[in-house]
C-alpha cells in the first residue's frame, strides 16, 4: 500500500511537470487540491487556491517557449515528493527574468510537494539564479 502511494505521488509530479512544459495549465492545476498553497520563496510569492495559481502560471508561462525539465533527482514518501531539476527555456517576453527576448536560459529548480488525498496540497519551488546558455 505504501509503495503504491509513493509510486502514485511520483507519477503525479511527473504529469505536473509534463503539463507545465507543454503549456497545459488547466491540467497542471487539476492536480492540486482546492486549497493549494504555492510558494516561490526566492521571489517572495505565496499564492492560495487554484485560481491564483492558474493565473500566475498563465502569466509566467506566456513568457517562455521550448520549456524542458531535466530531472537530477526525485524521491517520494507517502505525503511528499522532492524534485531537483534544471529547467531550460527561451524567453518570449520581457519582465519575468532579467534577459532579453530570445535568450535561452537554464535555472536550477528544486520543488517540495506536499500530497493530500492524492493531490498536491502545497508546492514550494526554490529557484536558483537563471543563467543564459
What are these regions (language model features)?
Residues 14, 30, 51-58:
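Internal, well-ordered alpha-helical scaffold/interface segments
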Residues 21, 47, 123:
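Short glycine/serine/threonine-biased micro-segments
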Residues 35, 45-55:
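Short beta-edge strand/loop motif at the mouth of beta-sheet-based domains
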Residues 1-34:
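Short, low-complexity N-terminal intrinsically disordered segments enriched in polar/charged residues
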Residues 1-8, 18, 39, 54-133:
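A beta-strand edge to alpha-helix "cap/lid" segment located at domain peripheries
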Amino acid at each position: 500500500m505504501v509503495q503504491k502511494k509513493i509510486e502514485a505521488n511520483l507519477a503525479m509530479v511527473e504529469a505536473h511537470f509534463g503539463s507545465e512544459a507543454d503549456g497545459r495549465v488547466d491540467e497542471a492545476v487539476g492536480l492540486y487540491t482546492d486549497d493549494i498553497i504555492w510558494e516561490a520563496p526566492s521571489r517572495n510569492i505565496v499564492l492560495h487556491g487554484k485560481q491564483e495559481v492558474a493565473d500566475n502560471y498563465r502569466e509566467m508561462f506566456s513568457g517562455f517557449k521550448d520549456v524542458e525539465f531535466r530531472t537530477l533527482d526525485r524521491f517520494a514518501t507517502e505525503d511528499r515528493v522532492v524534485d531537483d531539476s534544471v529547467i531550460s527555456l527561451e524567453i518570449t517576453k520581457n519582465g519575468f527574468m532579467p534577459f532579453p527576448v530570445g535568450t535561452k536560459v537554464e535555472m536550477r529548480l528544486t520543488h517540495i510537494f506536499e500530497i493530500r488525498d492524492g493531490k498536491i496540497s502545497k508546492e514550494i519551488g526554490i529557484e536558483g539564479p537563471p543563467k543564459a546558455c
